[in-house]
Amino acid sequence: MIPTPVIVTFANQKGGVGKTTLCVTFANYLVTKGVRVVVIDCDFQHSIMKCRKADIRKYGEQDMPYEVWAYEANDKAMITSLMEKLHNDPEIDVVLMDSPGSLKTEGLIPLFVNSDIIIVPFHYDLVTVPSTASFLMFVDRLKKAVGERMKARLFIIPNLNDGRIGKRSELVIWDNARDTFSNYGYVTAKIPKRADMERFSTMAALDMQATIVTPVFDKVYQSIFDTLQPIREKELKGIQLTENLNPKPKKKKKYDPNIVRTKSASLMRNI
């Protein structure tokens, strides 16, 4: 258990890189580890929420392994408030955010600033590589602009990789891209292009998904529980010590997750 939730955001401005599928498969992976997960669908298509509704019709709501909430990322104030409240929810270990692709989305800045980990999937092709490079530079500029408030670690995942594609000259470009991307974050092993990775379920991993993604997800899991968890525990002890030395006359109002679930349920009915 982690004292305060770790927020993991899946993001890239380039569509079609498997961002949403990886978000759900990572949720399914974490559940098998006994991690308390919440998935928040902020993508404009709300594909995860639509899948969850289909899974509920098929399996029943009581059997769902984790909650899925839907939010509109265009509402900057709502996203800012949500992120602040999530950091103080003791009932959650990891929050997975599926972010929208457009960098013009109002709520994207507070979402990134408050994330502990940002996972950036991409493909090795002549369109996705430069688009991903542009996105990584955007995140880097944001980190420099906000300073210590943004501590997100980046995991950059070569996703749906097809080793049969690419001329010799293009393979050189891919190698150079990997070297460049490593300046912004940790570039993981490749996830191969398989039919199993072209669909997903919010109930459990499908077919061979777990086998395909586990080597990559293990790295992210280790970052959360071998590195971030001890840091969070120290931070919590420091906060508790400060509160004991300087008791406040009034307690801060406790976050009620039911409020969030009510808003999410309202949005879910409209999808």
Where are these regions (language model features)?
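Conserved C-terminal guanine-recognition region of P-loop GTPase G domains, centered on the G4
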Residues: 132-148
